C-alpha cells in the first residue's frame, strides 16, 4: 500500500516537471541574429537596419553625448496592419548595456508611432544618445510590439561585431 502511494507520488512529480518544462520551453524568446544591412524577421515584420551616422540634435533636443542614428526599412509580411514604434529598438554597447532611443522631431523620417500596412515597406530613422566610439562594438535589439504577440527578438550587429 505504501509502495503504491510512493509510486503515484513520484509519478505525479515527474508529470508536473514534464508539464512545467513544456510550458517553459514554449515561452522562451527566439533570438535571430544578422549583420547591419541584412534582412531579419521579428514577428510579422522583416527589417533591414543600417548605421546612418551621428548628429548633434536640434534646438529642442540636445544629446548628453552624441546621437547615433539608424535607418530602419520594415516590411509587414502579415495580412493585417501592424504597429511600429521607436520603443521597439534599443542599442546595446560592448558591456551589454541597453539604451532606449531618444524621440524628437529631427526629420520627416523619425519613427515615433506608425501603423504599417500589409505587404508594404516603409523607411524610418531613430537615434540613441550614447558615448559613441566607432572602434567599439554596437548592436541593435528589436522587440516585437505587444500587438504582434511574438516571442522573437532580433539582434543586429551595427558595428565591430
Task: Describe the predicted segments one by one.
Residues 2-23, 89-90, 116-161:
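Surface-exposed edge beta-strand/loop patches
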Residues 20-34:
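Sec-dependent signal peptide cleavage junction
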Residues 30-64:
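Low-complexity, acidic Ser/Thr/Pro/Gly-rich terminal tails and inter-domain linkers that flank the onset
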Residues 41-45, 94, 143-147:
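Short strand-coil-strand connectors
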Residues 62, 75-122, 152, 158:
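The feature marks short-to-medium sequence segments in extracytoplasmic or secretory-pathway proteins
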Residues 64-70, 122-123:
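Short, solvent-exposed loop/turn segments enriched in Ser/Thr/Gly
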Residues 71-75, 127:
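Short edge beta-strand/loop segments characteristic of extracellular beta-sandwich folds
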Amino acid at each position: 500500500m505504501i509502495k503504491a502511494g510512493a509510486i503515484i507520488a513520484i509519478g505525479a512529480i515527474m508529470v508536473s516537471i514534464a508539464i512545467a518544462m513544456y510550458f517553459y520551453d514554449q515561452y522562451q524568446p527566439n533570438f535571430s541574429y544578422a549583420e547591419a544591412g541584412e534582412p531579419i524577421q521579428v514577428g510579422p515584420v522583416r527589417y533591414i537596419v543600417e548605421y546612418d551616422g551621428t548628429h548633434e540634435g536640434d534646438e529642442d533636443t540636445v544629446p548628453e553625448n552624441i546621437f547615433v542614428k539608424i535607418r530602419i526599412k520594415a516590411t509587414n509580411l502579415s495580412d493585417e496592419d501592424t504597429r511600429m514604434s521607436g520603443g521597439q529598438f534599443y542599442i546595446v554597447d560592448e558591456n551589454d548595456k541597453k539604451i532606449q532611443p531618444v524621440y524628437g522631431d529631427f526629420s520627416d523620417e523619425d519613427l515615433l508611432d506608425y501603423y504599417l500596412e500589409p505587404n508594404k515597406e516603409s523607411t524610418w530613422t531613430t537615434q540613441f544618445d550614447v558615448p559613441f566610439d566607432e572602434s567599439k562594438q554596437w548592436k541593435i535589439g528589436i522587440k516585437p510590439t505587444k500587438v504582434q504577440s511574438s516571442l522573437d527578438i532580433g539582434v543586429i550587429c551595427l558595428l565591430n561585431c
